[in-house]
């Protein structure tokens, strides 16, 4: 038998950009588009993390046409093709190794004269014959008519022996990190040094009762749709239990 409160409940969609929050006390408040304020007894934060880009105009031009920030998402489309990965950390090395199992050739473009990745990841990269590491290289542009066909590179930028050349590729993968979209919640929730929301162990619970974090906003490691969906399910179950414990449903 459903309670009167449950019968009265309905789903309300509110589309817009969350621009502020007040989690100091329940009911919690979230401001949409800097004007509309939503009050809620419980909140699931699933704002994700945005991939960092180099800032090239061509990145937007070729988005979905050869430019990607997720090798495991889009790598399949580059089977037996030539791709480039930008970055020098663990993520970049992981992406390069993954793509090496699909692509004909992988170029790892590294701005510095060394890799920042862990020793074991560096060793994994070097074991793949179809991965070429381009140290001291900067990607400064992309080109192609109907998609990415190549990248403009500068070797030893700013040095007397600076060299500029073009490299033919089919795909351009960015692996220079992600920025969690947690700014409007940082005043109330614990985050790590990069901004990911810290939850209690494997649960989606944050330090604020009734506020939960799910998906990439609380996951700096996996960042996959299926893991985000799983954590979203856990957050929904926790939110229901919280509301029930407060006799709100």
Give residue ranges: language-model regions.
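Glycine-rich Rossmann-fold phosphate-binding loop(s) that bind the pyrophosphate
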Residues: 87-89
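Rossmann-like dinucleotide-binding cores of NAD(P)H-dependent redox enzymes
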Residues: 5, 91-143, 244-249
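An active-site-proximal "capping" alpha-helix that borders the catalytic cofactor pocket
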Residues: 227-243
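FAD-site-proximal beta/loop scaffold in flavoenzymes
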Residues: 50, 55, 60-77, 176-222, ...
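AMP-binding/adenylate-forming core of the ANL superfamily
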Residues: 43, 151, 168-174
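Single conserved hydrophobic/aromatic residue that forms the stacking wall/gate
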Residues: 1-11
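FAD-binding core/adjacent interface of flavoenzyme oxidoreductases
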Residues: 13-81, 157-162, 173, 197-201
């Amino acid at each position: 038998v459903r309670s009167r409160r449950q019968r009265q409940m309905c789903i309300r969609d509110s589309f817009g950009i969350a621009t502020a929050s007040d989690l100091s006390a329940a009911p919690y408040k979230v401001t949409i588009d800097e004007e509309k304020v939503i009050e809620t007894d419980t909140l699931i934060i699933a704002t994700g993390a945005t991939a960092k880009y180099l800032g090239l105009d061509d990145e937007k031009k070729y988005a979905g046409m050869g430019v990607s920030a997720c090798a495991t998402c889009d790598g399949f489309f580059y089977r037996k093709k030539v791709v480039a990965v930008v970055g020098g950390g663990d993520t970049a090395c992981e992406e390069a190794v993954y793509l090496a199992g699909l692509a004909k050739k992988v170029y790892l473009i590294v701005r510095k004269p060394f890799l920042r990745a862990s020793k074991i990841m560096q060793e994994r990269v070097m074991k793949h014959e179809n991965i070429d590491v381009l140290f001291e290289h900067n990607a400064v542009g992309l080109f192609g008519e109907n998609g990415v066909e190549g990248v403009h590179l500068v070797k030893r930028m700013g040095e007397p022996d600076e060299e500029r050349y073009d490299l033919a590729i089919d795909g351009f993968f960015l692996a220079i990190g992600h920025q969690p979209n947690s700014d409007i919640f940082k005043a109330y929730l614990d985050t790590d040094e990069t901004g990911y929301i810290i939850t209690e162990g494997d649960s989606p619970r944050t330090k604020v009762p009734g506020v939960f974090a799910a998906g990439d906003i609380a996951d700096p490691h996996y960042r996959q749709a299926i893991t985000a969906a799983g954590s979203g399910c856990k957050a929904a179950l926790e939110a229901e239990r919280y509301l029930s414990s407060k006799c709100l449903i």
